[in-house]
Amino acid sequence: MTNQSTIDKLIEMHMTSMADAFRNQMQDISMKEIPFEDRFGMIVDIEYTSRKNSRLKRLIKNAEFEQPDATIAAVDYGHNRKINRHLIERLATCEYITEYRNIFITGATGSGKTYLACAFGMEACKRYYSVKYVRVPDLLLDLQEARDEGRFKDALKKYTNPTLLLLDEWLLMRVTEKDSANLLELIHKRRKHSSTIFCSQYLEEDWYQKLGGKDNPLTDAIMDRISFDSYKIPIMSLDPEKDISMREVYGLDPSQAQ
């Protein structure tokens, strides 16, 4: 078997990085002095790394992050904000995902909620978890349209399948009974096998009324499923008169999420 035949077969098996590495070794005279086992290990490492990198790129692309450049390392803990750095660094390990626990990120507009959520999502991608970002207004519209058209189960899978779901603008507006039913279906199916990050301008104690309060029989069911064992990250202002939008701090377009 010729070397070119080996290269062609590697390419046919979609092992292009391994094929390139093998070709480079054949052209490098110094490689002849290295034992076969070591050379083969080097080639396998190159293919392995290439596949891992490709998988990571796909996960990040499929997540559809609002802020794809967000990182935990770049999270700003200053600028007149009170934020739990120790908890954030702990959650960056993604242990909460293995525990199937949720995260609540609350704070005013421009406080950096979306950035932090996307940073958590990026850490999850780096550990090869599937992630999905979505604005709740878009989510509710998508689910209700799907229900009206008889394709609700298929639409729901987009949001139940990811290991980590980022729900931005959570309860920005009061939801309808139909919205509540769709949310309950989503939250129930994700419970005990995945994690969700909720980003909201409102404190958790206000969510009950935003969901309809006592007038909505589904309110208790929703809150019970998302609140238990959830991690809370309130982003608070130390002095409202000195507030600065985190969009400016992170160099983001003013039209981007909170």
Task: Walk through the language-model features, giving the residues of each.
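Loop/turn-to-beta-strand initiation segments
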Residues: 101, 128-130, 161-164, 191-198
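Short glycine-rich substrate-engagement loop in P-loop NTPases that contacts/grips substrate
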Residues: 80-89, 131-160
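Post-Walker A helix-loop "phosphate-sensing" segment adjacent to the P-loop in P-loop NTPases
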Residues: 121-134
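Interdomain "pre-motor" coupling segment immediately N-terminal to P-loop NTPase/helicase cores
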Residues: 11, 16-67
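Phosphate-binding P-loop
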Residues: 92-100
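Walker A/P-loop nucleotide-binding motif
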Residues: 100-116
